[in-house]
């Protein structure tokens, strides 16, 4: 096949002209005419010759000249021509081709592709003339074209488009088509190629291959719906259930019995209390449903005139069974509404507004009234009845009395009349005050005379009449109180004014106003009470104990001879002799092991947290501020325990500090320091360097010896020449007397003792002291501060002020507080000491162990008094010999305790003469005054054990005094069964103790006999051993035999 291609001349205008025709001669072959074709060319001002090239196989090409150039050349000369346009404008000249030569066809296709690629390469290389790639032409507002640079975003989008275009596959127009023939039943080449180039969908966009099951929609025709409706109506009628038909309108249906037949009743508007022109709104669907309903409402028996009456409203009947004159009906059924002039009206038809008021509706008003009455009566009647209710009063009389009560409480002409309700709201007409009082009197007399069995109704009316008559008419005093208290905002005058306004209202006062009046009266009473207390001497309400904000002046710390060049205190020889304190009563802190083990300061019945852990300071300010927060304890108000009085006046130096308003000053967090003695309780504290005993050693007082810090602070004011003697006196004499956790009174006495020998310590400043009223502890704060906050602050600042606690006539609870606690409290706990049952068990353990009991009595000399709870314990205490042992001991040690034990011994002898437990308890109760008098002479410390014993004896005395009066009057006292149970329990405990004593005794005897037998056999001849062994066995049998 021969192909001739050409390119038409390129012009600036598009024209159409007939293709050139001519003759083409190939070698010696005869010339052949060219096929005439119509060619569309682009006209241009430049005329170029056309060349036609024809080649067959390997023969030389034949060039045919014409008036146009080649297509490639024309394309290169005109860069603005699009590839697609040049391709569309190319013309092909066909000549006669031999169809069997496939090689010629391949050359023809290759030339076409070569020309196409040349044109495409030229188009990609060309660029716009005069405008850069990153510029564009815009038109200004004045109509002038302007070249401006493209924005970075536009360039970015352009480059993206070019990248996408370059990535698209090149699809040639003359590409060979793939075969669609399938070989061997497999996929064809075109299908395989399409699958390879097909874009894969994302997984979430891949269509599901699951075959969905399409359910058939159940449809029912009108006949089926009617059949279903009839079946449902039958079922509901049988069960007397309610039906609600919901279409365009809602219809509610229930079933009632009339004339011994069950009818369907529709809820119409007038049954809900609404009077409308159309009593029931329905459409075609609703009317069709009502027609179906009418076939199952009632039966086919005709209903004669007069039968339809009140209570038939909304009932559905068929038109054929009504013989009375009736209105039209929108369907075959008839819904009864009411009657007017003997004519029945259907509820579905519309009547005039006038007629809607004239119609006598057939609603059962009385039935509705009793229905509402029964519902509310049953719902709101009280359940706190102590009897079973039955019908004992006449029902007619009950209804009459209920009507009279209704008229008395709610005077009206008709209970459904809204005008009567308005009169009652406005208190006018028949509901006015005088009218109601007159009516109440009449109705009360009627009930008294005609219904004598209803006395409760008369009482209710009497109370009601009294409430209406309770009017306050004392306007003169009301006006005077108003003139005195009005405008005065001081003290209780506003409460007086409000109370006066409430009292003048009389019977119209509400319960809430009565409650407010009581509150106002309470404020007035409080004002009078406070005013009376303020007048009294030594009242807590007037107690104010503000701390001085000025620091106490200590001359010792201001003397230049006592300070170094940095202003620090010089201990001198005092520092050397202070070793006696640090070596005996302080322990060394090892910072390498951390401060956690020292953070909690254990005291009896509680603990206090030190701030020693805050010595590690973080560099983060936020964390540092968090560290400056303390841990508050339970707050305690100002009570009698916070103050000290002398002849009725407050001793402020021996009291807790308060604010100006009288509230207690609560301690704040005390931050720690190293190697310092902190003194000063008022103003800013003073920090004194500790003596250099060992370099970089940190000391903390041992548990129970925190009061040593007081003596260390006193050492600052002691002369250096007296320091050795001072420290020896404290160590050898005072600390031995005080021991662990002494009372504040004992510490103050020790300070007075030191003041006698060393007067300079009188003005020595004390460390900070905090008061814990809950555990009755005085905390002496050292340089490690206190993380626990919320304690009261003791105002005592100097040794001289602390000595004031030693005054014998000082009334103070603080002087009995422990600077820690007692050993007895520490060992057993205050909760056990306060429990009489625990104390008597402790006494039972010592009944057969007199030495242990003697040790317990050293801490608590009143322990034997708990034997008064049980006659059996007293007898065992006497019979065991422990009482006699203690008497012999205390005759030499404390005669007052010996007298108390003698009284107990005489009581035990009296108890032993009686056989019954009740008689023995009466003997114990009669001896209580004598025991209390003997106890009062015992001089014991005012600690928890003493206070617990005082409460115990007071309890016994208060229980016994009423019994004495009854016995003196000749009455028999019936004891509770619990006394015998308690006695049996205590006797069991005594028996166990006795069994343990017997077992120990038996073991001791046996060991003694075995040792005697061994000793005899070692010293005597063999022939005498057997005889002696038999004697030992007989003695052992006699001694160890069980009874």
Swiss-Prot record:
This is P3N-PIPO polyprotein. Residues 219-362 form the Peptidase S30 domain. One of its GO terms (molecular function) is serine-type peptidase activity. Keywords: Host cell junction, Host-virus interaction, Hydrolase, Inhibition of host innate immune response by virus, Protease, Serine protease, Suppressor of RNA silencing, Transport, Viral immunoevasion, Viral movement protein. A motif (Involved in virions binding and aphid transmission) lies at residues 672-674. A motif (Involved in interaction with stylet and aphid transmission) lies at residues 414-417. The record marks 362-363, 820-821 as: Cleavage. Residues 698-820 form the Peptidase C6 domain. It comes from the Viruses. GO terms for biological process: proteolysis; symbiont-mediated suppression of host innate immune response; transport of virus in host, cell to cell; viral translational frameshifting. It comes from Turnip mosaic virus (strain Japanese). Signal peptide: none annotated. Belongs to the potyviridae P3N-PIPO polyprotein family.
